[in-house]
Design a protein with these regions (language model features):
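Feature captures the catalytic cores and cofactor-binding loops of soluble hydro-lyases/lyases
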Residues: 1-155, 169-213
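Short amphipathic alpha-helical "interface-anchor" segments enriched in bulky aromatics
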Residues: 162
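C-terminal binding/interaction regions
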Residues: 159
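Channel- or pocket-lining gating/hinge segments that regulate access to a cavity or pore
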Residues: 165-167
Length: 213
């Protein structure tokens, strides 16, 4: 899977489209807050924060799930409140603990806090934004399918993320994607090079057989 890490999510999205694969990725409701690109296996959980309540599961269950996965891990937490974002799971303390476990990414449809601290950690953070408080935050489940910002995630899914968003990589097509991405990039760069050259003409552009790019 190492070849996938060399590509940005738009290139891999193009490759998935050429492979005829239905895609699942985050929409504009989730943005990268900190960190760089990542490629890792999903560990999932759900949380609530808006109203008081008992913990459904201890945070240690999430840590155990992270430790059970070989290789880089992406923690994906769905805020299941009717209106997400009342409080944050991820901040300095929980972030430091997950950083110590070596995760590569964190994705949530909720909000996070302690942004300056998060920027110093070794994993990327994608969230709906920032908030002030922890509020009544508690985890309600670990290890079940979740949906964050339009992206459906099952535990064990392979996720690729960068400044554009987070994309699920189907395992049956993962090995084919780098070659397809390279093929598409060569086609696109030929068009870009022509557009920047002295050979470019408006008439030639109108004759170019392109459906979309």
């Amino acid at each position: 899977m190492s070849g996938l890490a060399d590509w940005e999510t738009p290139a891999l999205s193009n490759a998935l489209r050429r492979a005829g694969v239905t895609q699942s990725y985050t929409d504009g409701s989730i943005q990268r807050i900190s960190g760089g690109s990542f490629l890792g296996t999903a560990v999932t959980a759900t949380m609530r924060a808006r109203e008081p309540g008992e913990d459904g599961v201890p945070v240690a269950d999430l840590h155990r799930a992270v430790l059970a996965v070989e290789g880089p891990v992406v923690v994906v937490i769905e805020d299941v409140d009717e209106v997400p974002g009342a409080g944050a799971f991820l901040g300095e303390v929980n972030g430091t603990l997950l950083d110590a476990l070596g995760i590569s990414g964190f994705v949530t449809n909720g909000r996070v806090r302690d942004e300056p601290d998060l920027r110093g950690m070794g994993f990327a953070v994608h969230a709906a934004g920032l908030c002030v408080a922890r509020a009544h935050m508690r985890l309600t489940a670990v290890g079940l399918p979740v949906r964050v910002g339009g992206l459906s995630v099952t535990p064990g899914d392979l996720l690729h993320g960068d400044q554009h968003g987070v994309l699920r990589i189907p395992p049956e097509t993962a090995s084919r994607l780098p070659a397809l991405a390279e093929e598409i990039r060569a086609e696109e760069q030929a068009i870009v090079a022509w557009a920047r050259s002295s050979d470019f003409t408006p008439a030639g552009l109108l004759e170019l057989k392109r459906v979309r790019h």
